[in-house]
């Protein structure tokens, strides 16, 4: 790890210090408040037993993205259409993101890129479908990939014309496995590097599945062929959105392994289609919990991708909620833009750790009481 961003001590820099520091400085002060965009998707890879801890059962994992999206949009309610599914330990990172969205008053857009169950009315339909399991080598049709790319490109143009910069987040259960597959398909060694919702990353299981999917790929496959074979709908939408938005504004890809894979995919598409690539405009932002996960080593993946990676130093050791303190034991690490929202809080409001913990604790108080 390189160290801290000099102008914002609560932000750490894992890779790409020069670009990361310059990017942080450009987005540090009001009135340059961003919009938060969260793209929800689904891959049937998530139904494989043991593949993810983001929902205890395959049935739970089908609603995880919908529940996280609902909590982002509506916050605490007397009743939920999709209640947050129980985790092995800890609280959904949607709790962090929602608390910080409220405190910063960020505009929010939640997109359905392909979900297995009906979305909420507030979610923007992109006309996608869930991806099949990556082991089939036919996760998405070429037509669906082209459609999702156009949707992402169009929304990237629209949003970048309305906001000075964008935080783009995701929720895809099983998405670190498709991230591993996408990186490998693009020629980037990623085995044993991607994160996991499990306390100890399940690298062996992921690698076995990815090998089955990659076996279907022809030699020298182009990026669209790769993602159609082994990817998920979020990857296509976010890569297009970020690539288009970065022509005119800054982009924070809020996540870990999945967003590093999206960064690599977007760059590969830019090279393949001879589109402008603005690396100074795009950084990946995550959490300290993921950076310090010795079973993942995503900083090594970021180095291989040559992707600037920053992270919040947020620490819940002194939280009054056991579900938040569980983050310090590695039970939950990142998701739904939690790291990116915290980074925005450091940049825009100058919040230190105690202030940010208090903001999240106060929402957790209400959540624990169901009000």
From Swiss-Prot:
Record's InterPro entries?
Answer: Nict_dMeBzImd_PRibTrfase, Nict_dMeBzImd_PRibTrfase_arc, Nict_dMeBzImd_PRibTrfase_sf
Membrane-traversing stretches: none
Gene Ontology terms, MF aspect:
nicotinate-nucleotide-dimethylbenzimidazole phosphoribosyltransferase activity
Recorded family membership: Belongs to the UPF0284 family.
Which NCBIfam families does this UniProt record tie to the protein? Answer: nicotinate mononucleotide-dependent phosphoribosyltransferase CobT, PRK04447.1-6
Q: What is this protein called?
A: UPF0284 protein tll2306
